[in-house]
Curated annotation (Swiss-Prot):
Annotated GO CC locations: extracellular space
Organism per entry: Caenorhabditis elegans
Gene it is expressed from: flp-7
Subcellular localization: Secreted
This protein's name: FMRFamide-like neuropeptides 7
Expression sites by tissue: Expressed in the ASI sensory neurons, the ALA interneuron and the AVG interneuron from where secretion occurs. Expression in the ASI neurons is necessary and sufficient to maintain serotonin-induced fat loss.
Length: 177
């Protein structure tokens, strides 16, 4: 009894191994064609579709879908070979970002460089440091240009403003009468 079970198991295992090898060969054939860059002919594609049910189920069992690489191209799933060709033929992929910088398209990296080299408005503290601002407040006081703060203090401390001049004009008129 034990011997016949063992033989059945061995036979079943052998069938499974053979089915896996045949499935591997069928998957490897199209990949070799893809590497050389050739398209499969219509006859080959039709032959793939006419696969026996046993083959399909065994392929699923061993983790391979019945759709092979050649049919993946037809149904729009990308194989590794296609990804590299996408980069070549100008569809945007993450790899191209470095080349975008090279060919002068603006990337986030370049924006920070623009700030560094003064193409974008720098913040005021940097502008004062590099002497680019019109004039900072301390030097404005020195050069006698009025800031809003100075005007209010002038009124407070009795320096001439428009109101003060008007009052003095009225007094002068009264004195002359």
């Amino acid at each position: 009894m034990l011997g016949s079970r063992f033989l059945l198991l061995a036979l079943g295992l052998l069938v499974l191994v053979l089915a896996e090898e045949s499935a591997e060969q069928q998957v490897q054939e199209p990949t070799e064609l893809e590497k050389s860059g050739e398209q499969l002919s219509e006859e080959d594609l039709i032959d793939e579709q006419k696969r026996t049910p046993m083959q399909r189920s065994s392929m699923v069992r061993f983790g391979r879908s019945p759709m092979q690489r050649s049919s993946m191209v037809r149904f729009g799933k990308r194989s590794p070979m296609q990804r590299s060709s996408m980069v070549r033929f100008g569809k945007r992929s993450p790899m191209q970002r470095s080349s975008m910088v090279r060919f002068g398209k603006r990337s986030p990296m370049e924006r920070s460089a623009m700030v560094r080299f003064g193409r974008s408005p720098m913040d005021r503290s940097k502008m004062v440091r590099f002497g680019r601002s019109s004039i900072d407040r301390a030097s404005m006081v020195r050069l006698g240009k009025r800031t809003p703060m100075q005007r209010s203090s002038m009124v407070r401390f009795g320096k001439r403003s428009m109101e003060f001049e008007m009052q003095s004009n009225e007094k002068n008129i009264e004195d002359s009468e």
